[in-house]
């Protein structure tokens, strides 16, 4: 099934060239199917690139998805035109009264800044709090995962001396969660961050479940026991070139970054990168959307109390 996007969104041309099924709002209006309504809070600098990455994953699922793009209303984007933002993005006040099947909150280049010092932290907290009553399931990515664990569950992160960048092997910690259906025993996922969460604190928290971890990269998948919040510590949405682009950017800024691990062939930054995580990323988002959104969300979104708990399925 397709992902439904606004008419003329730039990502459409890229996705269609990759044989990803997308549908314009005009075309979708002629179908009598209840789509999944997903809101994306895009905090990444390059909005169009991140839109494309996330829509690529949503477009590979068997469900029709109706996407709204959300911005922090008083924060200008330095890397995306005002025209694009005004055309395709909504302010929170425009969606506050609505309910959604799913919410995706992206990462942000804020890894070394205390949460309380982030300029728009109050807005992030407000949106997270709102989501707990207005969204069936929330997918937090990278920085947003740390922010969500801090705000909702009081967990603190540890700032790393060096940026953790690369593609790392992960393992499931359980066989029994619908989110992990189809996962290999070990799988790859990319990371790009300056902080990490304490694995033992996650394990000991009564409201959280650790579903996947890595010896090198630490906690990766964490699910709240009420199934509402999924925290992904890495970037399964990244395209093949993203880690290289970040590495080259850091080099150009004189930051002396470490070479992304397990990413370039033979760990040589002059060689080609190897994408080992795309199938995992597609399966992760597909399972989330199917098992934690579609199968739990009420048909009538105006009644969020009608969510179906897993125990009754």
UniProtKB/Swiss-Prot annotation:
GO molecular function, one term: homoserine O-succinyltransferase activity
Catalytic reaction equation(s): L-homoserine + succinyl-CoA = O-succinyl-L-homoserine + CoA
Keyword Cytoplasm tagged: yes
UniProt keyword annotations, A-Z: Acyltransferase, Amino-acid biosynthesis, Cytoplasm, Methionine biosynthesis, Transferase
Site residues, Important for acyl-CoA specificity: 111
Pathway annotation: Amino-acid biosynthesis; L-methionine biosynthesis via de novo pathway; O-succinyl-L-homoserine from L-homoserine: step 1/1
InterPro entries, per database record: Class_I_gatase-like, HST_MetA, MetA_family
Residues reported in the UniProt entry to bind substrate: 163, 192, 249
Active site: 142 (acyl-thioester intermediate), 235 (proton acceptor), 237
One Pfam family here: HTS
GO cellular component, one term: cytoplasm
Enzyme class (EC, first level): transferase
Family of this protein: Belongs to the MetA family.
Annotated function: Transfers a succinyl group from succinyl-CoA to L-homoserine, forming succinyl-L-homoserine.
HAMAP family named among the record's database cross-references: MetA_acyltransf
The protein's name in its UniProt record: Homoserine O-succinyltransferase
Species this chain originates from: Shewanella baltica (strain OS155 / ATCC BAA-1091)
